[in-house]
Regions:
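Subset of outer-membrane beta-barrel
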Residues: 9-382
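Sec/Tat signal peptide C-region and signal peptidase I cleavage site
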Residues: 4-8
């Protein structure tokens, strides 16, 4: 699966994005996080924290919650690619929680044919997560996640060598919140970290080389300021960097070997890039950009978001996401709203790209969540 690198608006010799497989793992699954410019490492805990930072779950108010999220994807290009995301958690006592999610990313119907007949295939990606989070103090928690990833991108079912691909991965995350006093108001300040998709490389049929998973480092902070008894305002900032090595360029090959032939370059790439293990790639990713430190900084994606909440029932959100042109140029504003009514919540998010050529423009996300604790109490009253 190819990320949206095709749409970068930069000179070809300056365009050298980090490359990885399983694009669905990089798609924000829920409306709230997406409305905040794709920020979520340290935002107030909610049911969809499984994607952003599962270490937040021990700090949730409700004991159990389930959410269903839906995203029609790339509607500016096609009309049948979408992602469904089911997430839920259960708090065990006052200091720990278990959580999980199921992600299904459909690439729609694709017309193909074998030697005799035309056929329709439905390529897709999916992932199943399970997490355990633990509060180590009244302010700090950690979490570990295990993930099974499955990708069936086959367009030719007649070849014996054509088979789905799968991989295992793990996440490590941490969350810290404190309550400083600003003026006369007790605020909530939080910090979050999530290293996701640490795992094996994945090999697709017909490929000579295994591909990297989208291993990602997410760091974030947020500040919530209560305006009065009913109103509060929060801001969040996330920084994301893929822990995947940068593809070596022909310029690097020429500089190191004094040669410029394509065959030698391909062999050099195979030795210096394709043969890199996923763990080695994590460490290389901090210092392997052809542009040095400047290039490493360009690989960081920034997300900033703001949220206004009234009486914990109604929310308005806005955000901005920035990606350097050399990495894909995905720049867009986001807006959204949320309503909480008794035992369920409904959220919506919308993307407004800075350039109409951005295929993410007008992307809509919908989320529906159920407070299982509230449902249980409601049934007991009856």
């Amino acid at each position: 699966a190819l990320p949206l690198w095709t749409f970068a608006q930069e000179k070809l010799d300056e365009f050298n994005p980090v490359q990885y497989a399983i694009i669905s793992q990089t798609i924000s699954p829920d409306a709230r996080g997406a409305s905040l410019g794709d920020a979520g490492a340290a935002t107030d805990p909610d049911v969809n924290s499984q994607h952003w930072n599962p270490a937040k779950y021990p700090f949730t108010i409700s004991r159990a919650d389930v959410a269903l999220n839906y995203t029609p994807w790339l509607r500016q290009l096609v009309n049948d690619i979408d992602q469904a995301y089911l997430a839920g958690y259960y708090r065990i006592g006052e200091h720990s929680a278990v959580s999980g999610s199921l992600r299904y990313f459909s690439l729609g119907e694709v017309q193909t044919s074998d030697a005799d007949n035309a056929m329709t295939v439905n390529p897709y990606e999916m992932a199943i997560d399970a997490s355990y989070s633990l509060m180590l103090s009244e302010k700090f928690s950690i979490a570990a996640t295990l993930r099974w990833i499955y990708s069936d991108l086959r367009y030719d079912y007649t070849s014996e060598d054509n088979s789905p691909a799968s991989a295992f991965a793990a996440d490590l995350s941490a969350y810290y919140q404190t309550y400083p006093t600003i003026g006369s108001r007790e605020c909530q300040l939080a910090f979050g970290l999530n290293i996701s998709n640490i795992g094996s490389k994945i090999t697709f049929s017909g490929s000579d080389a295994a591909e990297f998973l989208p291993t990602n480092l997410r760091l974030g902070t947020s500040l919530m300021v209560p305006i009065d008894e009913y109103n509060k305002f929060s801001i969040a900032l996330d920084a994301n960097k893929f822990l995947v090595p940068t593809p070596p360029t022909m310029e690097q090959y020429t500089k190191e070997t004094g040669l410029s032939d394509s065959q030698g370059y391909d062999q050099w790439v195979h030795e210096h890039y394709n043969n890199t293990s996923s763990i080695s790639g994590i460490f290389k990713s901090f210092s392997d950009s052809p542009e040095g430190f400047k290039g490493e900084m360009k690989e960081i994606q920034w997300s900033v978001g703001a949220e206004y909440t009234y009486n914990d029932k109604f929310s308005l959100r806005a955000g901005y996401h920035h990606q350097d042109p050399s990495q894909g140029n995905m720049k867009y504003f986001t807006v959204g709203a949320g309503f909480k009514m008794s035992v369920f919540s409904l959220d919506a998010g919308y993307v407004i790209a800075t350039a109409k050529t951005n295929p993410l423009d007008q992307t809509l996300r919908l989320s529906l969540s159920f407070d299982m604790d509230g449902i249980k109490d409601l049934l007991h009253r009856r």
